[in-house]
Amino acid sequence: MAAQKKKAQDEYGAASITILEGLEAVRKRPGMYIGSTGERGLHHLIWEVVDNAVDEAMAGYATTVNVVLLEDGGVEVADDGRGIPVATHASGIPTVDVVMTQLHAGGKFDSDAYAISGGLHGVGVSVVNALSTRLEVEIKRDGYEWSQVYEKSEPLGLKQGAPTKKTGSTVRFWADPAVFETTEYDFETVARRLQEMAFLNKGLTINLTDERVTQDEVVDEVVSDVAEAPKSASERAAESTAPHKVKSRTFHYPGGLVDFVKHINRTKNAIHSSIVDFSGKGTGHEVEIAMQWNAGYSESVHTFANTINTHEGGTHEEGFRSALTSVVNKYAKDRKLLKDKDPNLTGDDIREGLAAVISVKVSEPQFEGQTKTKLGNTEVKSFVQKVCNEQLTHWFEANPTDAKVVVNKAVSSAQARIAARKARELVRRKSATDIGGLPGKLADCRSTDPRKSELYVVEGDSAGGSAKSGRDSMFQAILPLRGKIINVEKARIDRVLKNTEVQAIITALGTGIHDEFDIGKLRYHKIVLMADADVDGQHISTLLLTLLFRFMRPLIENGHVFLAQPPLYKLKWQRSDPEFAYSDRERDGLLEAGLKAGKKINKEDGIQRYKGLGEMDAKELWETTMDPSVRVLRQVTLDDAAAADELFSILMGEDVDARRSFITRNAKDVRFLDV
């Protein structure tokens, strides 16, 4: 995208807006349009409005997008594009009202207005209006400022304001709390998405501001043992009228995808200095790719179509993979880096340690599924494959030193793959000697229905023993682990598969790993990681999550992985049943409530702090952590694969400074990280 705004040669006006249907169904079934009414659906409202602004940038008419999380819970999105049309539409009402009140009304249906766009522009913004209590629009176009307000989706009347030579649109909305489970936006979630959009649109500036940071939320560090004197009424009044503190971030990447790859690899050791960067254009198609190999063992390839994150890949990724595998094998054979008698390197061998971003722009995209996470255009595969064949061949020929390093890494990966295959076969042979082909230490459940079955992966033999005794053996299976499993972030697959604990987990789940993974063979639809509530327990949980993320990611993507929440405290009352607390705050609350109710706590061991799961007997473990009617399970989600990839690299990788910096920044944040 050129940083300079394109002249509005193409007509984007009332005639460009096409209506397909009305808004009636949105409030009745919001999930059909935004996925859910939870936190994810709430943030989807922002994405819809931001997509509009970014589409103006993609078309060459906007250079800056400003997003503000307003103090009162609303959101403001502004761009310096052409402005939403205000002229009277063929339907007899102002065009802005058509865009805001009619579903499937937008300029994206008119190829003259937008050659390429992410999703159908007018669709999203009308859905935002339908699911908001109030929406305000301010427009600069046709020589004037214009404004319109929508109360419960109904327009109050378009107003013409002062003359102006500027152009652009500003949309403010307040999500309806009667529709959404929460109306609180997460700053980091918004920041990650906007950063992604800035990477994908070279030269675009996106500013994010959060006005919700008030004086009460600012905590100063304690620098002495002497507390400050209480503030006077006048001082407090002055503070309340002072401007609120805000936090803001600006995203601007002149290098575009090259900067994106640098960002992905910043916590990893690149094995060649230059970043491979190329693009190509065809009829109705464009592709841009940036890539660089690192010394790690995990592939980190992220794909986008019209700036939409295609988590499930699609034809653009297929074309890239096919070309990369072909080019590297040909180069390796031609340069005798691979002997003629040697088998070809596989795609997995070549992509080990690869960080890449693939961005295509398609005039008529076909997305598979409602969530638009897989690109289906068959012609895109051959287009991307052709461009990649030409450009990658040129890069390998022009950079023989770097090319040799890449090929040698792939050859080393192939050797590890062969060793891993032998390790897999060993796992299978070993499994066959166990009863039913399952690990000997697995206490399986009686149910044969995976949908009703749960597997508890438990830290330590002692806790495993209590879990086996306390479980409901009809549907709960127990797999105890002895000590810490291998850190898969720092080990190649052949070493990983030699680890006894990893073998037991893979065999128990039944799905296989990597290219052999088959979710249809999953033996338990709930996989519960149960570890001590201390630092060691959290480390073991992270090791397990890293294994699942790197080797069996669809388990997380399909919502099968959970974290158990064992209690931290047991309160023993005299002449009353004991109570369990899962945090210091809950302990204090239960204690205060009990004492107010006239209960008496045991004097000697009234409050017991559990140091580990092994301290609980079978009955306590069932009552607090395993009984479906009372237990607390945290589902592990994967909202952003790139962010999760970065998180695991920081927490479990080789870069000590990056890990220390992350821990320092997040030490005060006691919320769980949804990875």
Swiss-Prot record:
Its EC number is 5.6.2.2. The keyword Metal-binding applies. It catalyses: ATP-dependent breakage, passage and rejoining of double-stranded DNA. DNA supercoiling inhibited by (fluoro)quinoline antibiotics such as sparfloxacin and levofloxacin, which usually act on GyrA subunit. DNA supercoiling inhibited by the coumarin antibiotic novobiocin which acts on GyrB. Quinolones lead to gyrase-mediated dsDNA cleavage while preventing reclosure. DNA supercoiling activity inhibited by aminopyrazinamide and pyrrolamide derivatives, probably via effects on the GyrB subunit. DNA relaxation inhibited by ATP and its analogs. The keyword Cell membrane does not apply. The record marks 484, 487 as: Interaction with DNA. Gene3D superfamilies: 3.30.230.10, 3.40.50.670, Histidine kinase-like ATPase, C-terminal domain. Pfam families: DNA_gyraseB, DNA_gyraseB_C, HATPase_c, Toprim. Residues 453-567 form the Toprim domain. Changing residue 499 to D: 17-fold increased resistance to fluoroquinolones, slightly increased DNA cleavage in absence of drugs. Keywords: Antibiotic resistance, ATP-binding, Cytoplasm, DNA-binding, Isomerase, Magnesium, Metal-binding, Nucleotide-binding, Topoisomerase. CDD domains: HATPase_GyrB-like, TopoII_Trans_DNA_gyrase, TOPRIM_TopoIIA_GyrB. Mg(2+) required for DNA supercoiling, DNA relaxation, DNA cleavage and DNA decatenation, Mn(2+) substitutes for relaxation but not supercoiling or cleavage activity. Ca(2+) does not substitute for supercoiling activity. InterPro entries: DNA_gyrase_B_C (IPR002288), GyrB (IPR011557), HATPase_C_sf (IPR036890), Ribosomal_Su5_D2-typ_SF (IPR020568), Ribsml_uS5_D2-typ_fold_subgr (IPR014721), Topo_IIA (IPR001241), Topo_IIA-like_dom_sf (IPR013760), Topo_IIA_B (IPR000565). It comes from the Bacteria. GO terms for biological process: DNA topological change; DNA-templated DNA replication; response to antibiotic. Its main location: cytoplasm. It is found in: Cytoplasm. Belongs to the type II topoisomerase GyrB family. When the enzyme transiently cleaves DNA a phosphotyrosine bond is formed between GyrA and DNA. In the presence of quinolones this intermediate can be trapped and is used as an indicator of drug toxicity. DNA gyrase is intrinsically more resistant to fluoroquinolone drugs than in E.coli, mutating it to resemble E.coli increases its susceptibility to fluoroquinolones (most quinolone-resistant mutations are in the GyrA subunit). The B' domain (residues 448-675, Toprim plus a tail domain) forms a dimer; when reconstituted with intact GyrA the complex has ATP-independent DNA relaxation activity. The same fragment (also called TopBK) when reconstituted with intact GyrA or the N-terminus of GyrA (residues 1-502) can catalyze quinolone-mediated DNA breaks. A type II topoisomerase that negatively supercoils closed circular double-stranded (ds) DNA in an ATP-dependent manner to maintain chromosomes in an underwound state, while in the absence of ATP it relaxes supercoiled dsDNA. Also catalyzes the interconversion of other topological isomers of dsDNA rings, including catenanes. Gyrase from M.tuberculosis has higher decatenation than supercoiling activity compared to E.coli; as M.tuberculosis only has 1 type II topoisomerase, gyrase has to fulfill the decatenation function of topoisomerase IV as well. Negative supercoiling favors strand separation, and DNA replication, transcription, recombination and repair, all of which involve strand separation. Type II topoisomerases break and join 2 DNA strands simultaneously in an ATP-dependent manner. This is DNA gyrase subunit B. It comes from Mycobacterium tuberculosis (strain ATCC 25618 / H37Rv).
